[in-house]
Amino acid sequence: MKKQKRNLLAALALLAALMPVHAQKMSGNPLFPGWYADPEGAVFGNRYWIYPTYSDAYEKQVFMDAFSSRDLIKWKKHDHILDTAAVKWAHKALWAPAIVHKDGRYFLFFAANDIQNDEETGGIGVAVADRPQGPYKDYLGKPLLDKFQNGAQPIDQFVFHDADGQYYMIYGGWRHCNIVRLKADFTGFEPYADGSVFREITPEGYVEGPFMFIRNGKYYFMWSEGGWGGPNYRVAYAIADSPFGPFERIGVVLQQDPAVATGAGHHSLINAPHSDDWYIVYHRRPLTETHHNHRATCMDKLEFDDQGLILPVKITFEGVERNKPLRH
């Protein structure tokens, strides 16, 4: 009898331990604790990854963390995958990571120092590692781009891999956006056929935070509008037949909900492998917070209508459903 009781208690304890795991069917928003912004989403191997900006005073933004998950529910933190100790020319404002896996290595593009003119040191850099969780080290020993071009501040870089294999860097703050052709080894830029290097593709309303993807042969260009420190930060988009546009603004797809959060913006998308399931990863400010740096990383479903237009995203507290664990 005692043995049966012990077995029963053990079974009940095991069931109790497992129940919370099975009961959690939604990710919840925010995805993980802490103030993090400008999230870059990616899929590497059997894990989803998020690379955000650590949201604090510029002088304290001297490192980057990453987060990984197999099912979009449970997220593991990877501390200090990059910090300014590994990038001698960077000393503050490490922002807006963009990640690329190429030739067996992981390239992390980042902005640093928030330069205000061409005389200051900083701009867009590249770090490299053998694993998605790093540690990352400076790839070039200097910025990849440290000058203003077409009025665009060298920040908020996104690396776009086109269908023909070409890699582009789309970037820019101060209401201007450029697209440049990256060299195959990411050490610099290649000129276009006309000899130019920087092509401006700024759409109406653009402020910062560009993102591009292809779906059904169309190029979707997304960006953030408004001030990042205020409640009206938002995401708009356009569609074109080329990565060079022209991009005519269609409308807003992500914005605040007075019942949920404010300042929803600076996003990226994750397309679940082998599916047409899309998730928007973004930051927002909880209703309880007013400090501009109190931004949290969240995820919600992104969907399209029959014409391929993006449906307005409903920001939620629930987040997204558990995804089938990824396998290699």
Model feature map: region roles:
Residues 23-328:
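Carbohydrate-active catalytic/glycan-binding domains of CAZyme proteins
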